[in-house]
Amino acid sequence: MNAFSKFSQKQFRVFFSYKNNPVKLFSLFLFIQFFAVCNSEQNSEKKEILFRLISEFQIDLQKNLESAIRTKGIVGAIDVCRTISPQKEADLKKEFPGVLIKRISEKPRNPNHRPEVWETEIFNQWKESQKTGMAPYTVVLSKDREVRILQPIVLQSPTCLQCHGGPQDINPAVSKKIAELYPNDQAKGYKLGELRGAFSATW
């Protein structure tokens, strides 16, 4: 017997035991309604916070990368990208216990950034939508007390191609540095406008 069946039977037994007591039955319905409203309000608040954190993550990463490119060049910026993203993920997890925000991709540079099953399903939805001309869209999933958000990352700047484009876009020195840091790198061969990955948030 699965967990849902057990839960349903338990609900039925509670309802049956209360059916001859209108006061208890009314109280039960009020409790269920209150619980549902509380969950909905809590998830709504979580969603707002997650969107804000994703935005801050994206802005901080872009700001630091642009600064590193100006001062250290593309090769030096690779090290910055390699360290700042995991550090930002760890800082958010520490500041907001239970929150997990990370960048993921089906063609990751960091092997720890591969998508989970539910994320892969959404990637597949995005790819099917793109065939009809629809751009990837942000997906929000809410169930019980958990909220999940997947926000697409699309390559929009020619600068991104200097690390993620084809052989004609990537300087040999950059290719060498990437190979040293990421021997199993898959995050190349992209074109402008293509789906690079996503910001994934769970709370």
What are these regions (language model features)?
Residues 4-26:
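Bacterial N-terminal signal peptides that target proteins for export
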Residues 36-37:
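C-terminal motif of bacterial Sec signal peptides marking the signal peptidase cleavage site
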Residues 166:
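Cys/His-rich metal-chelating microdomains
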Residues 162:
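Short, cysteine/histidine-rich loop/knuckle motifs that typically chelate Zn2+
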Residues 41-159, 169-203:
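Extracytoplasmic c-type cytochrome modules immediately beyond a signal peptide or single-pass transmembrane anchor
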